[in-house]
């Protein structure tokens, strides 16, 4: 069972905590992580691309020249695909790229990445992440005291306006709620900061 140190907001170690083996201590499954990531990115696509067919392009209703006797190839419209400014043959049309993956696969991908953070020593657990006011400077100092540098993802169990607003303008730092956790953010941000209550909630939800 993996064990990690627990720090207060000033970066002082206050205790340690044993993490659930089946969530934070599994062998990361890269294939599942890749599959779920591709699904996540596909679901983010707007799918609004569109081209006009020969029927939709303005003009081209008249036959450009007679069928026979000119020596040229027969043509029916100046908006056929082979013409400049003609319609597009088999071009993209608006469509949805959304598809679903198994709930089990999604959960396994999250657990794989959480375990990866433990293995790579990129997980920081704090006993409480609470600020008395909305102040970016206070949040910057807290992260510095915790020795968290670079891209950082903070996951909260419940909405905390002071933390959300104080971290919003810090470059390379993103704060989300646990119900919005996803593989993309876990891969994009090197460091993961979890308050103790978030750890407990994760162990309840993903048990």
Model-derived regions: residue spans:
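Extended polybasic, low-complexity segments that bind anionic RNA or targeting/receptor surfaces
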Residues: 1-46, 92-207
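A short, flexible low-complexity segment enriched in Lys/Arg and Gly/Pro that occurs
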Residues: 30-68
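Glycine/serine-rich anion-binding loops at beta->alpha junctions
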Residues: 54-90
């Amino acid at each position: 069972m993996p064990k990690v140190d627990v720090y207060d907001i000033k970066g002082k170690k206050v205790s340690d905590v044993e993490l659930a083996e089946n969530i934070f201590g599994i062998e990361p499954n890269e294939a599942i992580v890749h599959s779920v990531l591709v699904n996540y990115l596909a679901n983010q696509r707007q799918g609004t691309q569109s081209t006009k067919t020969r029927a939709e392009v303005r003009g081209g209703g008249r036959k450009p020249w007679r069928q026979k006797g000119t020596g040229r190839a027969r043509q029916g419209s100046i908006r056929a695909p082979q013409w400049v400014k003609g319609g597009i043959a088999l071009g993209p049309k608006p469509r949805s790229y959304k598809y679903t993956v198994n709930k089990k696969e999604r959960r396994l991908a999250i657990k794989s990445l959480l375990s990866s953070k433990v293995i790579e020593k990129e997980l920081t657990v704090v006993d409480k992440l609470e600020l008395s006011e909305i102040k970016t400077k206070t949040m910057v100092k807290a992260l510095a005291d915790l020795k968290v540098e670079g891209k950082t993802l903070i996951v909260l169990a419940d909405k905390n306006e002071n933390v959300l607003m104080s971290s919003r303008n810090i470059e390379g730092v993103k704060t989300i709620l646990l119900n919005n956790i996803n593989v993309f953010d876990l891969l994009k941000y090197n460091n993961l900061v979890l308050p103790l209550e978030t750890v407990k909630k994760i162990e309840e939800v993903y048990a």
